[in-house]
Amino acid sequence: MHRYRSHTCGALRESDIDQTVRVSGWCHRIRDHGGLLFIDLRDHYGLTQCVADPDSPAFKDAEKLRAEWVVRIDGKVRRRPEGTDNNDLPTGQVEIFITEIEVLGPAGELPLPVFGEQEYPEDIRLKYRFLDLRREKLHQNIMTRGAIVDSMRKRMKEQGFFEFQTPILTASSPEGARDFLVPSRIHPGRFYALPQAPQQYKQLLMMSGFDRYFQIAPCFRDEDPRADRLPGEFYQLDVEMSFITQDDVFAAMEPVITGVFEDFAKGKPVTKSWPRIAYADSLKKYGTDKPDLRNPIEMQNVSEHFRGSGFKVFARMLEEERNQVWAIPGPGGGSRAFCDRMNSWAQGEGQPGLGYIMWREGGEGAGPLANNIGPERTAAIREQLGLKAGDAAFFVAGDPSKFVRFAGLARTRLGEELNLVDKERFELAWIVDFPMYEYNEDDKKVDFSHNPFSMPQGGMDALLNQDPLTIKAFQYDITCNGFEIASGGIRNHRPEAMVKAFEIAGYGEQEVVDRFGGMYRAFQYGAPPHGGMAAGVDRIVMLLCGTNNLREISLFPMNQRAEDLLMGAPSDVTPKQLRELHIRLNLPEN
């Protein structure tokens, strides 16, 4: 018999009754039923009930066991007594009568119990992550993550893609976040950077004559903590293709992502044919570029009904051309109590309030706005929005670029409060036609709005002759249930267009050459049209595991202060290490 096991803890069935077996694992739970000891033994594969009575030669050893001790158990498989089956376990019809126990690894007092799913402070969970990972739900999430990545790889290869590995040590480049820098010992005063994404390398692969690249790529960004992103690193399904259009990328990737979701959606419906929503339309309808399409509410511009009306606040605003009034329908929200609750919520979000109209059973509008604009305008708003008696509409006004984010929050809030969101489905969509540039209010300059390597719609002509803030890019995102899960674009593969695109964003040609020298040189020697995308593995896994916390699907994550509490990173290093790197610390005063 094998030194440690003849079977795993998830393997035994009724067909194994009367066999002598050996299992090894952790003591998951120990129960004393009046002299009868039950030990639930757990390993990676499952749970097996083991039992010892005073007649067992191993009874005294069994009495000494404690939770999470690692043991080897020998014994005979027998049928559980009638009425004690556990149908929640694959091994739930049998148990092992213990004849011998060997302690392989005793455990001290546990700072974090493994049995059960009690909530514990995050810092305790991260410091003792090896215990946390033994817990069933987190353990299963990690296994699901591995299976999702396997599904991605399989589907990419079925689409004719080939997996490559690109360098981890590379050059620093401006890609939207701070780099993690790695000092060079051989070249004092110079630094490598960990890649924020394999962007340049995957484009260089296309210029090297390869096609249909993919990689499950680690990416590193030195960003301030955010609720929807882990500090430090994340993984993406990185993709690039040659001689393709935007539609070709969509045709290749839609079945991959749809298939992965269908594999792990546990029967929840998944969008079959994805809608394509222009960025500007997404903002107007949903107040965000990552809409949750499970929420049926669509906002509309109702400015014409308030222009010159008796509601002077909105009427005066509309005298300025850039201002608008948007309506957010609230089906079923036509009660004074609900409207007042939404108004209070808006004030809690820093707004002066949230104007509303309710429609009574007779069809007449009610509320301060309705009283001010009169029944004719109120009826026209109701007709435009397709509302009925018992419904309401809420209004935001001013410069849309200033209020759009709040309008999106209000739409989300209404969908949740009115139970309009179907939580049991996955709604996927393409968001297209992103602006190439945006105005950076902090730096008072035009900046790239997304990927700086994207092709502008209209090409060089647009870069030379259009107002930069009106140029659209061949840039696209994939959204699911209110999350951006992928982003991509068709690349700018002509060197003169690349230089001009960066020039508009304030980078001179020499700076482009200095920062992107490898790619700039490659563009001089025949670059094919190419494009691709990157899908966030972590966010996809998070959605499919049904959690809102990325730490619940990551093996050894950092905390929100970018600290690895298990390994003690970031850590001090020795003076000798600093001398070898020619680094002298100049720390801020506390």
UniProtKB/Swiss-Prot annotation:
Pfam families to which the protein is assigned, alphabetical = GAD, tRNA-synt_2, tRNA_anti-codon
> Could you tell me where this protein is found in the cell?
Cytoplasm
Cellular component, GO annotation: cytoplasm
User: A single GO molecular function, which one?
Assistant: nucleic acid binding
Q: Where is this region: Aspartate?
A: 199-202
List UniProt keywords, sorted A-Z.
Answer: Aminoacyl-tRNA synthetase, ATP-binding, Cytoplasm, Ligase, Nucleotide-binding, Protein biosynthesis
Q: Where does L-aspartate bind?
A: E175, R221, H450, R491
In this chain, ATP is annotated as bound at R221, D222, E223, E484, G536, V537, D538, R539
Q: Which InterPro entries match?
A: Aa-tRNA-synt_II (IPR004364), aa-tRNA-synth_II (IPR006195), aa-tRNA-synth_II/BPL/LPL (IPR045864), Asp-tRNA-ligase_1 (IPR004524), Asp-tRNA-ligase_1_N (IPR047089), Asp/Asn-tRNA-synth_IIb (IPR002312), GAD-like_sf (IPR004115), GAD_dom (IPR029351)
List residue numbers at the site (Important for tRNA non-discrimination): H33, G83
Give the EC number. Answer: 6.1.1.23
The domain of life is Bacteria
Reactions catalysed according to its record: tRNA(Asx) + L-aspartate + ATP = L-aspartyl-tRNA(Asx) + AMP + diphosphate
Question: Which GO BP terms, alphabetically?
Answer: aspartyl-tRNA aminoacylation
How does this chain assemble?
Answer: Homodimer.
* Family the entry assigns: Belongs to the class-II aminoacyl-tRNA synthetase family. Type 1 subfamily.
The record's function comment reads: Aspartyl-tRNA synthetase with relaxed tRNA specificity since it is able to aspartylate not only its cognate tRNA(Asp) but also tRNA(Asn). Reaction proceeds in two steps: L-aspartate is first activated by ATP to form Asp-AMP and then transferred to the acceptor end of tRNA(Asp/Asn).
Protein name per its UniProtKB record: Aspartate--tRNA(Asp/Asn) ligase
Organism name? Rhodopseudomonas palustris (strain BisB18)
Gene coding for it: aspS
